[in-house]
């Protein structure tokens, strides 16, 4: 889905630091899987097989100041992440807003050294809407630059996932098809970015093990 990283020149130790950070937070995410499982009335190790050789990616974002922000202008528009969970250390500058269940946007309180954990769309589908993907957006700052780093911890591409048995029943049938994260993400990309559909046959022939993690 993505090409290889473009590491910047002239920053000694940057690549190693990022890779270490990704490995550390991926390990943290996997250590939290029993918590998700127990919250969904599953055995603690239920999710472990789905996260062997899992797909993790990392994104850095820079939001330059916008002194005169227009209506419906965003640094990052409203959306929910696609995967299982996202780790988002709180930035020093406000801007992140989350949509609550009443349809109101709010800014989470600033907590030093805190990491926000967002649930993603694949977890929402897997849990048959028991967990809600976290809608959020970013309002750009007016005076200073804002930087953000997000790490997305997802299941492996290949395992096929169906709505969890503890989240379905006679009065609550599955709302989503049985599919792998690969198939879901391909569907998402094709529906979000229309030009992406042109690569469907090429992606179908590509060995999934060759996809950059």
Please state what every model-predicted region is.
Residues 1-213:
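Peripheral, non-catalytic segments flanking oxidoreductase cores
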């Amino acid at each position: 889905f993505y090409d290889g990283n473009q590491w910047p020149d002239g920053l000694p130790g940057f690549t190693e630091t990022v890779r270490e950070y990704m490995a550390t937070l991926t390990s943290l995410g996997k250590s939290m899987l029993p918590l998700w499982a127990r919250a969904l009335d599953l055995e603690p190790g239920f999710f472990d097989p789905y996260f062997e050789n899992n797909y993790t990616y990392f994104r850095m974002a820079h939001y330059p100041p916008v002194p005169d922000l227009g209506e419906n202008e965003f640094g990052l528009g409203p959306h929910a992440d696609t995967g299982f969970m996202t780790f988002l250390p709180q930035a020093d500058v406000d801007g992140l807003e989350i949509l609550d269940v009443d349809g109101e946007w709010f800014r989470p309180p600033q907590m030093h050294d805190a990491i926000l954990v967002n649930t993603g769309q694949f977890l929402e589908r897997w849990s048959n809407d028991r967990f809600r993907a976290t809608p959020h957006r970013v309002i750009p700052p007016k005076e200073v630059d804002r930087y953000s780093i997000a790490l997305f911890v997802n299941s492996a591409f290949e395992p096929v996932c169906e709505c969890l048995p503890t989240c379905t029943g006679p009065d609550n049938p599955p709302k989503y098809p049985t599919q792998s994260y690969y198939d879901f993400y391909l569907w998402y990309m094709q529906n979000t970015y229309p030009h992406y559909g042109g690569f469907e046959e090429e992606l179908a022939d590509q060995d999934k093990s060759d996809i950059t993690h």
